[in-house]
Structures are given as C-alpha cells and as structure tokens.
Amino acid sequence: NGVPIDAVVADFMSGAIEELCPANDSKHWDIIEGQGSLFHPSFAGVSLGLLHGSQPDAFILCHEPTRTKMRGVETLLPSLDLCIEENIRLGRLTNPNIHCAGIALNTSVMSTDPKKLKDEISAKYNLPCVDPLKDDLAEIISTLKNIK
C-alpha cells in the first residue's frame, strides 16, 4: 500500500499517511520515504505532512555532503545539527519519543575518501553514519531494532 503524496490535497496529507501507519506491534516497521526537507521552500509542507502523519519513533537523516544549496533554489543547506533538532522538535508534536537513529550520506560525488567524514559525523552525533549504497547497514538496523 502507498499514497502518491504529491497528489493529495495539503489538508489531508497527514491523515493519508496516518491511515497507512496505524499503531503496530513492536515487530512491525513502517518505512516512510521522503525526498524533501523541512527546510526546502518548495517541499517543506509535504515533508511536515509525512512527519506528522507517520508519527515515527525514529528517522534516518539523509544528506549529500558536497551540496551547499538546496536543489532548484538558492537556499543554503542548514547544518546537520539544525536538521536533526528541527525534525525532532516538529516530530514531537505527534510522537514525543521520536529520535534520530542514524545519518545516511550520499558520497557518490565526493572527491575524497568519505570514511573520515562518516567517522567524524558518527562521533559528533553518537549515531551510525553510512552511505547506504556502499556500506553495511547493520549498525543502523541494530539501532532501529533497539527502539523501545
């Protein structure tokens, strides 16, 4: 099941996602994928609708480290700190227990070895940091499995 969220009237986005993500037992996961950002002026409404409607226990923050501006606009990218803080702050409106469970980096266009950057980010946030297209996901999966 799914919802083509871009085709849903804004007033009903959260409800459409909530309908797909009812409270489940601890052995069931709903994976909600969104490509927007709470900070992108063109997509923030959709991102917030997904966040509120899905009421996640955890989220994986996705980032492309060589990008300085958001795609299609001149808006600068916010820091990872601010992205994590705002996703948690706004997510707490529908799930007070939300937290960041990891960081996924798209390192495909990096000209340097991404290992150092991933290690630095992981140490700074005390979270797993991986490129999901290149790295083992065991650490992030383990973090998700340990959600109470």
Identify what each model region corresponds to:
Residues 1-148:
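Flexible phosphate-sensing "switch/lid" loops adjacent to ATP/NTP-binding sites
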